């Protein structure tokens, strides 16, 4: 296991990606763009945490953690849109937001 894979923030981001994958697979036809955008943002969070952890300088690490934090906010906004459009249930929405709040809090401490 690589060092970034042991980070709590990485594990939480992976958990959100799993939830996102399940959620987007259950969307009705015609919402491919919304699903793709959410998946891309969730994957970007995971990738930027990993890349930030692998950088040698604090400035380089911080740059990637900031990107991951911004992508986390995009994921939350995407969940809000899905909720507004009644495309996600309350339980999945609440769990997703809970995971994202944890990711944001941890990334903020890492900056």
Predicted regions and their residues:
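Amphipathic alpha-helical assembly/interaction segments
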Residues: 1-111
